[in-house]
């Protein structure tokens, strides 16, 4: 990137890097550390015209969610509906919605965005304590 005159480095973090989730505390800690790493990299690399950001998705309709439900839910459809209800939009995100944030951050339109974490979580992180039913 230095030889090319700059660029955009985008790390995949997670909303769990901002929130406490029982049972996945180590995962959340690593994502929080990644957010901090990106901020430091952004400062270090700014003079080289390299922007560094993170994207923090919430729950996404993805193979990761499907594996989680298959491993932990007795009624997968009911569990999926419960995940949807955790989000103010009433549904989990899509892979395409998360990818669109990456495309934007890599674009010239995001030329002044660095050392920033963008949550793509459908409002999940804004709810505070999550409902269980």
Where are these regions (language model features)?
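A glycine/serine/threonine-rich, flexible loop-to-helix segment
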Residues: 47, 59-86, 127-133
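Active-site "substrate specificity/gating" loop of NAD(P)-dependent dehydrogenases
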Residues: 20-24, 29, 46, 129
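C-terminal helical subdomain
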Residues: 54, 62, 77-109, 113, ...
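Short C-terminal tail/terminal secondary-structure segment
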Residues: 19, 103, 114-133
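Residue(s) in the substrate-gating loop at a strand-loop-helix junction
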Residues: 14
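Alpha-helical segment proximal to the catalytic Tyr-Lys
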Residues: 43-47, 111
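Active-site helix of classical SDR
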Residues: 30, 38
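Hydrophobic structural elements of the Rossmann-like NAD(P)H-binding subdomain
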Residues: 10, 52-55, 65, 115
């Amino acid at each position: 990137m230095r030889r090319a005159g700059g660029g955009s480095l985008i790390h995949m973090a997670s909303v769990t890097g901002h929130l406490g989730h029982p049972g996945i505390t180590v995962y959340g800690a690593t994502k929080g550390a990644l957010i901090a790493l990106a901020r430091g990299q952004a400062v270090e690399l700014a003079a080289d015209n390299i922007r560094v950001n993170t994207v923090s998705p919430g729950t996404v309709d993805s193979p990761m969610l499907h594996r989680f439900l298959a491993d932990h839910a007795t009624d997968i459809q009911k569990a999926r509906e419960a995940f949807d209800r955790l989000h103010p939009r009433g549904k989990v995100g899509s892979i395409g919605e998360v990818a669109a944030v990456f495309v934007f951050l890599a674009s010239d339109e995001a030329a002044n965005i660095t050392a920033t974490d963008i949550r793509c979580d459908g409002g999940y992180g804004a709810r505070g304590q999550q409902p269980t039913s």
